[in-house]
């Protein structure tokens, strides 16, 4: 009986759980059908919808938005409950709209002071980012006192931020990034005591930043970069004990690095670049326990104070374009977690410190270009480097053969040094090498046996390379050969990392251009200023991804290969200052992206290809050739060209053939009189006076011969 009651009790408990589950589940199922939306909230949303147009995606949508689409387009269509509209969230009990997320919604138009958004009094979250809104929005939202999250980034909002911004006292997140806000930041910003993130970058703010910022004790992120703030950093920033990120770059802040930054013990990222800071870098900066990223570039700092004991947390140190002098400071070798070191464009001298071998476990990007460093490249100190740039120094010797073991190396730039070596064909073993720059050194010899599978940019110009290039030379240059899809191009990234991006200088379209960032789809080949001879390899036509091709200032001969017409992505072509002859291949006229070309100072002749690209070239691109002609050249370049209709032009091949013909004609012309003269003389010798002939011709010749023999 006891077992029966136990069993009955168990059943009762089980049924109770089932009933409870069903009742809860039915509530869940019924919830979407409940009409929560309050009428005045619905009206405000519908009016807001009519205030703006749905247009094209904003310029940044395709990059930053996951699924951009017009969210307001479906509002009101067969659904009267605004709480179920896309981008709208309501309070489950009261039906008040508390969140409005219209980011990436293709919305276009100008905000006015009476915008219906001001009637959504209970909003806590408002996200209008990644649209094309214009005008002044602040007067429309200054009374939304419940807001905790406000994101207006990536729009075209303008005007000043009013002092009434301080009324939004519950804000924890304020993002005005990438707009056109102007004027001074009001001191009432200090009333936002709950704020954790303040993002004002990429606007037109100016003047001194308000010292009231020191009252935001919860602030973790302060981003002010790309504005026109000036003066010294407010000392009250030293009170922000929770601050982890401080970005002040590209303003007009000035002075020395203030000591109160040493109070920011939680700081992980500090960017002071592109301002007017000066003096020495204080030693205490390297003792901040959590500091991971420091950017001091583009200021006028002159040196480093040595720290007592640097913290090992430092991962990225960028100090380019300052006035640093002397040797590279040795304390850098103690930053064992360093992944990026950029000290380019300074006045450092001496050797590259061997102690940098301490960094080999983590260092992936090293940039020391544009200094006065001397000696050779150290061996065996960089194991996992992805990019090495030591261009524009005074380095000597040879490339260390240990480079062939740098299996992660993607970029190698040693341009404008005094390196005296043969072509490093052994670098073909590097599986990830994409950029190789050897220009302006003393490299010499042939460059055969080179096949690079990943190489996309190679610049070996202005060296002493020589010899011929086999016809199949470029067959194995895979990265320049495979045509990328439109999707590949749209998804192209820049070489480098989040904290550092590779750069280089390249001759493009006749101008020395600096690539501040290198796209992963950019391709270029520059062999100019060497002593290459023979024909241009026909396999050049396999490099269908090539954008820039420069073979100028060599001794190439023969015809320009028609296979160049297959370089469908080509934008710049320079084959000037060679010994090329024949016609410019008509196929080149079909290259629709080719905007700059130079065929000058060769022995080219014949009809210049048609096509709009050729019509827009300057006369200097064709000057000093044997006889190029075409309607444009005859009309616009008469000073350097004679129309072919008035003159017959000959290539070196036809000149040789003509010389042969002329020689045969001359021989024939001389042959007939010779026969006549010979017969006449013979007739005289036989029938008339042989004594006279001997007297006239024979004795003088014999006398001369005997005189020569005697002597």
From Swiss-Prot:
Q: Any idea where this protein resides?
A: Cell membrane
**Which InterPro entries does the UniProt entry name for this protein?**
DNA_repair-toleration, Leu-rich_rpt, Leu-rich_rpt_typical-subtyp, LRR_dom_sf, LRR_N_plant-typ, LRR_R13L4/SHOC2-like
Q: How does it sit in the membrane?
A: Single-pass type I membrane protein
Say where the protein is mainly found.
membrane
Output the Gene Ontology cellular-component terms: plasma membrane
Give the Extracellular compartment stretches of this protein: 31-666
Glycosylation sites (chain numbering): 78, 114, 143, 167, 191, 239, 242, 252, 263, 295, 323, 347, 362, 372, 420, 466, 550, 590, 598
Keywords (alphabetical) are:
Cell membrane, Glycoprotein, Leucine-rich repeat, Membrane, Receptor, Repeat, Signal, Transmembrane, Transmembrane helix
Signal sequence region = 1-30
Q: Which Gene3D superfamilies match?
A: Ribonuclease Inhibitor (3.80.10.10)
User: Which SUPFAM superfamilies does this UniProt record tie to the protein?
Assistant: L domain-like
LRR repeats: from-to residues = 120-143, 144-168, 170-192, 193-216, 218-240, 241-266, 268-288, 289-316, 317-334, 335-358, 360-384, 386-406, 407-430, 431-452, 453-476, 519-543, 544-567, 568-591, 593-616
Mind telling me which residue stretches traverse the membrane in this protein?
Answer: 667-687
The entry sums up its family as follows: Belongs to the RLP family.
Tell me the protein's name. Receptor-like protein 43
Gene label:
RLP43
């Amino acid at each position: 009986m006891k077992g029966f009651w136990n069993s009955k009790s168990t059943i009762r408990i089980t049924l109770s759980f089932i009933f409870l589950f069903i009742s809860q589940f039915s509530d869940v199922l019924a919830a979407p059908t409940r009409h929560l939306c309050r009428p005045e909230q619905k009206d405000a949303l519908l009016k807001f919808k009519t205030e703006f147009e749905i247009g094209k995606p904003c310029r940044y949508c395709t990059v930053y938005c996951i699924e951009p689409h017009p969210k307001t387009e479906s509002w009101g269509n067969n659904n009267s409950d605004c709480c179920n509209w896309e981008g709208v969230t309501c309070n489950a009990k009261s039906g008040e709209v508390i969140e409005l997320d219209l980011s990436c919604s293709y919305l276009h138009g100008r905000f006015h002071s009476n915008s219906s958004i001001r009637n959504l009094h209970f909003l806590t979250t408002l996200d209008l980012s990644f649209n094309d809104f214009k005008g002044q929005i602040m007067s429309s939202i200054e009374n939304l006192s419940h807001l905790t999250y406000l994101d207006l980034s990536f729009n075209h909002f303008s005007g000043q931020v009013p002092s009434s911004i301080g009324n939004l006292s519950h804000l924890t997140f304020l993002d005005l990034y990438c707009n056109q806000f102007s004027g001074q930041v009001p001191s009432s910003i200090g009333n936002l005591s709950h704020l954790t993130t303040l993002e004002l970058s990429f606007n037109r703010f100016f003047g001194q930043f308000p010292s009231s910022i020191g009252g935001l004790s919860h602030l973790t992120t302060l981003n002010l970069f790309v504005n026109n703030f000036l003066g010294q950093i407010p000392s009250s920033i030293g009170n922000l004990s929770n601050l982890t990120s401080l970005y002040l770059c590209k303003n007009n802040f000035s002075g020395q690095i203030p000591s109160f930054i040493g109070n920011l013990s939680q700081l992980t990222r500090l960017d002071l670049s592109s301002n007017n800071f000066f003096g020495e870098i204080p030693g205490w900066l390297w003792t901040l326990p959590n500091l991971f990223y420091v950017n001091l570039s583009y200021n006028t700092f002159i040196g480093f104070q040595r720290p007592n004991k640097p913290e090992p947390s430092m991962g990225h140190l960028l100090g380019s374009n300052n006035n640093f002098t002397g040797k590279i400071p040795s304390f850098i070798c103690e930053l064992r977690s360093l992944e990026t070191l950029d000290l380019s464009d300074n006045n450092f001298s001496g050797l590259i410190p061997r102690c940098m071998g301490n960094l080999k476990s983590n260092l992936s990007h090293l940039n020391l270009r544009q200094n006065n460093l001397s000696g050779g490249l150290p061996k065996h100190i960089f194991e996992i480097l992805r990019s090495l740039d030591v261009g524009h120094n005074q380095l000597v010797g040879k490339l260390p053969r240990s480079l062939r073991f740098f299996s992660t190396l993607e970029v190698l730039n040693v341009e404008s040094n005094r390196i005296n070596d043969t072509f490093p064909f052994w670098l073909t073993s590097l599986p990830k090498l994409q950029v190789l720059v050897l220009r302006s050194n003393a490299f010499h010899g042939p460059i055969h046996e080179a096949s690079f599978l990943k190489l996309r940019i190679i610049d070996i110009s202005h060296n002493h390379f020589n010899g011929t290039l086999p016809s199949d030379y470029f067959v194995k240059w895979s990265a320049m050969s495979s045509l990328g899809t439109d999707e590949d191009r749209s998804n192209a990234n820049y070489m480098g990392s989040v904290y550092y991006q590779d750069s280089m200088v390249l001759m493009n379209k006749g101008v020395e251009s600096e690539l501040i960032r290198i796209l992963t789809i950019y391709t270029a080949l520059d062999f100019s200023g060497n002593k290459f001879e023979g024909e241009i390899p026909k396999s050049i036509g396999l490099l269908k991804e090539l954008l820039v091709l420069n073979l100028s200032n060599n001794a190439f001969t023969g015809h320009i290969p028609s296979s160049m017409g297959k370089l469908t992505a080509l934008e710049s072509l320079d084959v000037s200052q060679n010994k090329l002859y024949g016609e410019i291949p008509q196929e080149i006229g079909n290259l629709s992206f080719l905007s700059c070309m130079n065929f000058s100072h060769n022995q080219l002749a014949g009809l210049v290809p048609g096509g709009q690209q050729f019509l827009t070239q300057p006369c200097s691109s064709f000057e000093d050739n044997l006889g190029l002609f075409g309607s444009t050249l005859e009309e616009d370049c008469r000073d350097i060209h004679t129309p072919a209709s008035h003159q017959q032009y000959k290539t070196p091949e036809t000149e040789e053939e003509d010389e042969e013909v002329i020689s045969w004609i001359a021989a024939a012309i001389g042959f007939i009189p010779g026969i006549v003269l010979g017969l006449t003389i013979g007739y005289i010798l036989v029938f008339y006076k042989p004594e006279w002939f001997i007297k006239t011709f024979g004795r003088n010749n014999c006398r001369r011969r005997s005189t020569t023999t005697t002597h």
